[in-house]
Amino acid sequence: TLNAPLVSAQKFDPALLLQAITGPDREVSDFIRDPIRKPVQVLDFLGIEPGMIILDLYAAGGYYTFIFSKAIGPEGVVYAQNTVRGRQFVEDRQDITQGQALDKKIEQGKLSNVVQIIRPLTNLGLQPNSLDAVMVAQVLHDYYNPDPERALNMLKQLKVYLKPGGVIGITDHVGIAQYDNNELHRMTIAQATVKCLHSSFTMPSQCKKG
């Protein structure tokens, strides 16, 4: 089986990353999500570069873990975090658990720069100021909707691990204020923005939408 190589350019190259994530070592079930999730544009917007140290919070089946691994190259590290319980959830579009899906991605993709963390956020075992970036993909609403303070506490905990100037990337299902976003598993951009600002994060001049 041919595997697409890890990107090794000194700076982020969207064309190289696109080539790396369209190889035969990637799951088709992940590939078909790309038109909606736009991962190359997301990483470009976040300023991801080779050699970075990144935490993929609740990596689940590893959609972003795989992409980050290819983007940061052999000198970088991706920490793919899941809880024991989370690893037991069924992976979308597959008849395996999320933990099994992630294990499979790491093995088949030869993702030697991925380190799994099977611990809760409150006990990650990482050093403060050690991360260049944290990815929170389709997760923040799960913290916010039961109790907005949980989302605030989560963001504050993550900020401790970021280096000065580090970035947190948040992607989520966009909710509409008058709808039941808890039932729909969504949250509004305004809700996410307020919690980020209250966590002492600074926001870019324009958040990407869509």
What are these regions (language model features)?
Residues 103, 180-206:
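Conserved Class I S-adenosyl-L-methionine
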Residues 92-124:
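S-adenosyl-L-methionine
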Residues 120-121, 132-149:
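A short SAM/SAH-binding and catalytic strip from SAM-dependent methyltransferases
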Residues 16-49, 63:
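Class I SAM-dependent methyltransferase Rossmann-like catalytic core
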Residues 79, 165-173:
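Conserved beta-strand signature within the Rossmann-like core of class I S-adenosyl-L-methionine
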